[in-house]
Amino acid sequence: MSATPPRKRLSRRLTTTVAVLAAASGVLATAGPASAHHGRTVDVQMLSFNDFHGNLEPPQGSSGTVSELQPDGSKKTVPAGGVEYLASSLRAARKGHPYSVTAGAGDMVGASPLMSGMFHDEPSIEAMNKLGLDVTSVGNHEFDRGRDELIRKQKGGCHPKDGCYEKGKKFKGADFPYLAANVTDEKTGKPILKPYTVWKHNGVKIGFIGVTLKGTPDVVTAEGVKGLKFGGEVETINKYAQELDRQGVKAIVALIHEGGLPASGAYNYDCDTPGPGAGISGAIVDIAKKVTPKVDALVTGHTHAAYNCTIPDPSGAPRTVTSAASFGRLYTETTLTYDRGTKDIVRTPAKHPRAANHVVNRDQPKAPDMTALIDRWKKLAAPVANKPVGYISADINGRGSEAYEKPLGDVIADAQLEALAPADKGGAQIALMNPGGIRSDLAYKASGSEGDGVVTYGEAFTVQPFTNMMASVDLTGAQLISLLQQQVSGPNEAEPKILQVSRGLTYTLDLTKKGAARIDLSTLKLNGALIDPAKTYRVAANEFLAGGGDGFPAFKEGKNKKLTTSDVDAFIAYLTAHSSKTAPLDPPKADRITVVK
């Protein structure tokens, strides 16, 4: 028996418009937001979250905490997350709100811990169904396994290779619509999934448009986005907002898998001090300033940051832009005041949508149906997940480290170098690891019954969940220099992506300079010798990075490419070879990149 029958009834009221009208040519006519109460108003509660990434169990280490700003200006670390607590939080929040809709901003699955990832994220889709998700945009990670797998997650059906995981049970797919307005088939030009949907309840109608970042092909393997075209976020949202407006749907929310970087890491930081939107930077700011005033609120994601900002729309009216960090640690509650007369959301300086982020605390009762779901899938995963693969003496921070060089990044790069150094494995001299591929920390505290300091297969998989194949290529010293300069120039100049480097490679990152000059070439050495632009070096990386992903096109110039083991297998082999109960692995010093600020 479902624990959430009211949500199931409400979900049926979320109806999708399937007809896609031809886009009007020329400049879209702008229309200001509802500015007066021409009829009775009703408050609609919108609960939202993003970047869940299949974290059904409470995340470990710093990935399972949020920073809370205290009245005296200090920060407090609060444990957070876990779908048992997320479901309880959302269900409690809905009480007393007859008009409530729950929305997501992408990356609900993908790069997931083993318990979800090894089952192609079917457990996470099942969990989203149970907790009452009404609608979500796609994110870049929804494309990790390609278009067909994403459509299977929407429509259901057993995995084409692995089949069904439970006897007599067929995967039903998502009860909620995945929206992908800016993702079209290269041949037909049509969206591969619905571009928008309309939520209806007692005469209230709110349109939801969903998009992922235009740069998705830069952060997903080529195979994952094969045959697809990713359009601009602003132009796509404006197109479908116009279409919804013509259909009489005036209240519109955009679900955007692209985000910003707040000035503070605290979830309750005031983004609007000293003025509206003053405390945020990044891609979402420009998007928010250009999206048509027909859209009343933006629910965003991708950067795993927490913020609630007011960024004025092109007409100057206040508009709320939200993000709820990641991994189910927070949810956002936004109040949308719907005017039955104008059929729009009220947005005036005196009254406009207000939002607040709430912590998914672990001191509340667990949702029993989610506990049962976790226990069921955990039992299926246990033979693989609980196997010890290594030992550590303390936390080794990766995802949770704010440093450019992360201790766990050093471990992973060393593991990849060791795996690909033998001549028959590629003969690598250097290994480079993209920081975005480090999905968690290695926590010393036990996550189950394995004991403190024991690293299980499941924990190692959570750090490296993509199972990318490892590649080694020939790069000249000049190409290697260009590659390292791309960390801080071109598309990565505003938000540097500092690659994690294997032992022996050292250099100085000078942040007092601009662009490519931040890489001090006079300090760039391999085993103490300066990198020679004319010499050839054998460089290892996961296949995504070696294919030019994350804004590193210099990697595509590599020659004599050789594929060998997977990244997670290399990582596990290294942990096993370099640790034991009596001699656990210590966190490395992370002293290969010297940072000058």
Give residue spans per PLM region:
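N-terminal accessory/precursor segments of enzymes
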Residues: 34, 210-222, 350-352, 378, ...
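Feature captures C-terminal
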Residues: 42-45, 55, 65, 166-182, ...
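Acidic, metal/ion-coordinating pockets
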Residues: 2-5, 36-358, 411-418, 431, ...
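Flexible glycine/proline-enriched surface loops and loop-helix/loop-strand junctions
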Residues: 221-222, 317-318, 395-400, 464-467
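Long, compositionally biased non-active-site segments enriched in small/hydrophobic residues and glycine
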Residues: 367, 372, 385, 389, ...
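Secretory targeting and sorting signals
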Residues: 1-36
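Conserved, carboxylate-rich catalytic/transport cores that coordinate ions
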Residues: 362-365, 410
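Glycine-rich phosphate/diphosphate-binding loops and the adjacent beta-loop-alpha structural elements
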Residues: 385-405
